């Protein structure tokens, strides 16, 4: 008897069963309310448990077979037509109310596919983080490479579980074509739809759409063509924790917290423009396919199994809470040494140093150096004067430029107006008459 009862309880509800659950008017007619639409969506045997909000893509998914042909999980216009037709069986045809009910039901059945994936992993105890870049790409098996990989993996995990968390580090793989650098990041993203290499411009108003639904974003083209100006834009972009974007059906823009991390690949050995304040956001790791144990695409199934355990190991570290998303002070020195290996020749610094060796005046400003040391005739952009300031200040602090210091107040320069700049520690007898000191009040007005 109990077996028969259990079978009845498990049997799908018919349309008539669901109709009995709906609120009706006094004449027995079904009320066309949002709540009745919700009841249908939650209990109709075709639609029940089908509609969920994907917290990664921030879109509504249909997550089970629903009886009509479809491709992909995301709810689309054709799906809506089928749902509207299904709702007509209950005498409800208000598209607006049905759409509202769908959003409510989806929101109450939200899920995060990457969190579900990571939480479902069980580590086998074999360490792979320290070896993965050597295994697939022939990178060095040293502490620096291990820490670089660990920071990147833990940053990716934290971005998923704590969207919008601060993580502005880019792991950059440097090596020849065909080494498998892009394939490594694609497989590291676990599913191809969680990976993207389609980010081409950072000033695109729809940049959020390029990030939406992805976990690992490869920026190969921008890294390959980076210059001093674009590297500043990339650094600023990496430091963002959210995008503000209005989804078409929404009335107001909303903050979209970042859930992705960014990776770089290049075969350029001088991909990092000279940055005197440090390129701490970029972690370069040289790779050599000839030294790798396997090519990542030789046996894709085996590579994916390896990567599953890589994430399982990283999750074990993440759950322990015993980690930092930055290098130790000692390892920072190693990072800076690696960055120096991939920096472009600092031609501007050399030109400025040479100019100062022959210069007889007692003061210089960035605009003067831009024109007289670098030979430019146009007005410098802000980033260009900032680069000159970095050359001077870093050169002075490192001892590369001796006998100069930044002057404390703004000075008036005959050709360049009131400027902050640098002065000789011991001024020569000539040149002082060409400048006049500006009071703090005037200086602040011109900064």
Q: What is each stretch, according to the model?
A:
Residues 1-128, 143, 147, 378-383, ...:
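N-terminal nucleic-acid engagement/recognition segments and initiation subdomains in replication
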Residues 102-212, 367:
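P-loop NTPase catalytic core of nucleic-acid-dependent motor ATPases
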């Amino acid at each position: 008897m109990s077996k028969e009862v259990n079978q009845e309880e498990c049997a799908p509800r018919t349309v008539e069963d669901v109709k009995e659950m709906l609120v009706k008017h006094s004449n027995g007619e079904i009320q066309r309310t949002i709540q009745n639409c919700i009841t249908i969506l939650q209990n109709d045997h075709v639609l029940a448990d089908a509609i969920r909000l994907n917290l990664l893509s921030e879109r509504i998914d249909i997550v089970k077979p629903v009886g009509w042909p479809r491709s992909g999980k995301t709810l689309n216009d054709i799906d809506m037509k089928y749902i509207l037709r299904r709702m007509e069986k209950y005498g409800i045809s208000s598209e607006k109310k049905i759409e509202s009910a769908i959003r409510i039901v989806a929101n109450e059945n939200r899920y995060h596919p990457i969190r579900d994936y990571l939480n479902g992993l069980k580590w086998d105890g074999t360490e792979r983080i320290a070896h993965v870049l050597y295994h697939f790409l022939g990178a060095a098996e040293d502490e620096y490479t291990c820490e670089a990989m660990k920071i990147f993996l833990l940053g990716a995990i934290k971005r998923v579980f704590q969207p919008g968390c601060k993580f502005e580090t880019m792991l950059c793989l440097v090596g020849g074509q065909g080494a498998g650098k892009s394939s490594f990041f694609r497989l590291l993203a676990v599913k191809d739809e969680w990976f993207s290499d389609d980010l081409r411009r950072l000033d695109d108003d729809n940049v959020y759409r390029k990030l939406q639904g992805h976990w690992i974003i490869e920026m190969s083209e921008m890294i390959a063509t980076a210059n001093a100006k674009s590297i500043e834009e990339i650094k600023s972009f990496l430091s963002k924790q959210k995008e503000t974007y209005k989804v078409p059906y929404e009335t107001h823009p909303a903050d979209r917290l970042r859930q992705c991390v960014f990776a770089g690949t290049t075969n350029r050995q001088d991909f990092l423009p000279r940055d005197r304040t440090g390129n701490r956001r970029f972690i370069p790791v040289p790779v050599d396919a000839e030294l790798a144990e396997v090519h990542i695409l030789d046996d894709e199934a085996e590579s994916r199994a390896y990567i599953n355990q890589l994430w399982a190991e990283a999750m074990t570290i993440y759950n322990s809470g015993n980690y930092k998303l930055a290098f130790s002070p000692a390892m920072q020195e190693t990072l800076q040494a690696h960055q120096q290996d991939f920096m472009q020749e600092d031609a501007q610094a050399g030109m400025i140093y040479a100019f100062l060796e022959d210069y007889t005046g007692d003061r210089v400003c960035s605009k003067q150096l831009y024109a007289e040391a670098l030979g430019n005739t146009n007005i410098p952009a802000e980033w260009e004067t900032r680069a000159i300031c970095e050359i001077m200040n870093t050169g002075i602090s490192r001892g590369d430029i001796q006998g100069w210091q930044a002057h404390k107040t703004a000075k008036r320069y005959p050709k360049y107006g009131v400027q902050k700049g640098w002065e000789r520690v011991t001024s020569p007898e000539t040149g002082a008459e060409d400048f006049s000191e500006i009071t703090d009040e005037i200086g602040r007005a011109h900064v």
